[in-house]
């Protein structure tokens, strides 16, 4: 079975990261911002796996596990903020977050 060339994997990772970055900059809904962040983190994880497989090292897979763990923590904190924002202001607009003061 032939492996996917490293250039193709890194190109896919770059495209996914760019799409996530565009979504992060364009959207004002906090749910879409969180989804864009997840796409960007998965693109970075894919780049680690592709680079690790190129040199037959397990480092890429270890970094993948680290990135996925970080993404899970980010998602849980982000969803908690999203729920509080929706409960308090009845909106998911990210500009309303500037009014949240504790």
Curated annotation (Swiss-Prot):
Reactions this protein catalyses = a quinone + NADH + 5 H(+)(in) = a quinol + NAD(+) + 4 H(+)(out)
The main location is membrane
Keywords, alphabetical: Cell inner membrane, Cell membrane, Membrane, NAD, Quinone, Translocase, Transmembrane, Transmembrane helix, Transport, Ubiquinone
What would you give as a GO molecular function for this chain, any one?
A: quinone binding
Q: Name one GO biological process term.
A: ATP synthesis coupled electron transport
Q: Which residues form a coiled coil?
A: none
Gene Ontology annotations for the cellular component aspect, listed alphabetically: NADH dehydrogenase complex; plasma membrane
Nucleotide-binding: present as a keyword of the record? no
Record-annotated membrane-spanning stretches: 6-26, 30-50, 62-82
What is the annotated localization of this protein?
Answer: Cell inner membrane
EC assignment: 7.1.1.-
Q: Does the keyword Transmembrane helix apply?
A: yes
What topology in the membrane does the UniProt record assign? Multi-pass membrane protein
Q: Which InterPro entries match?
A: NADH_UbQ_OxRdtase_chain4L/K (IPR001133), NUOK/Mnh_C1-like (IPR039428)
Record-linked Gene3D superfamilies: 1.10.287.3510
Q: How does it assemble?
A: NDH-1 is composed of 13 different subunits. Subunits NuoA, H, J, K, L, M, N constitute the membrane sector of the complex.
Known function: NDH-1 shuttles electrons from NADH, via FMN and iron-sulfur (Fe-S) centers, to quinones in the respiratory chain. The immediate electron acceptor for the enzyme in this species is believed to be ubiquinone. Couples the redox reaction to proton translocation (for every two electrons transferred, four hydrogen ions are translocated across the cytoplasmic membrane), and thus conserves the redox energy in a proton gradient.
Q: Which family does it belong to?
A: Belongs to the complex I subunit 4L family.
Its protein name is: NADH-quinone oxidoreductase subunit K
What's the source species for this entry?
Azotobacter vinelandii (strain DJ / ATCC BAA-1303)
What is the gene called? nuoK
């Amino acid at each position: 079975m032939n492996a996917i060339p490293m250039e193709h994997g890194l190109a896919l990772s770059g495209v996914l990261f760019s799409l996530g970055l565009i979504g992060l900059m364009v959207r004002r809904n906090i749910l879409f911002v969180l989804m864009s962040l997840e796409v960007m983190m998965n693109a970075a994880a894919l780049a680690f796996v592709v680079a690790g497989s190129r040199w037959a090292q397990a480092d890429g897979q270890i970094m993948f596990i680290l990135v996925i763990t970080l993404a899970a923590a980010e998602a849980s904190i982000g969803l908690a903020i999203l729920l509080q924002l929706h409960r308090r202001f009845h909106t998911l607009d990210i500009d309303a977050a500037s009014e949240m003061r504790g």
